[in-house]
Amino acid sequence: MSHSTEHNSRPEQSATLFIAASETDSNLYYATRFIAPDPFIYLEVKGERLMVMSDLEVDRARNQATVDRVLSYSELERRAKSQGVKDPGTIDVIHLVLQDAGLKDILVPPTFPFLHASRLQEMGYRLRTKRDPFYEQRVMKSDEEVRHIEAAQRATETAVAAAHQHLRRAEIRDNVLWLDGEILTSERVKKLIKIGRAHV
């Protein structure tokens, strides 16, 4: 990321910004407690934690995420258009939120998308990166988090053991595995594990 300086602490008058999928970004999941396979916008602005979500996900985010506010991407998009932006994109939407807060300094993770970073810098924003652990609190696990991790491990072990039982029951015919009259594919095994976890 060009022209960005690494800092280990957040300047007081800066925003934190993620554009990522929480399904693959553990820092973003930690911040929101919301699982999504597609990238979304997350901001920390003057002590307030915000998510900007598409119309498809906005209601689910409002019900499940542990943030202060969930904003509608399409509403911000319409607002940008009303201000003369012909075809608003992700950065135009972020710009509105940061403009409202009067902030120009942004703290981002090292994985922040380069093209988005370049666009923000072109608009006059100063970006700083911070290495992991982005949230120091993540290093310390609470008793509740430890219990959740242990429960997840037990569920996975039980589900995998159940899948092994299915494999032992399977028959080989013409070099193909069959179970209960159907071909036992790797996708079917994964599905059996997933179902097993859901019932633990």
How should these model regions be labeled?
Residues G89-R197:
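Flexible, acidic/His-enriched mid-domain "rim/lid" segments that flank
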Residues S2-G102, F112, R147, R154:
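N-terminal accessory/capping or targeting/presequence segment of soluble
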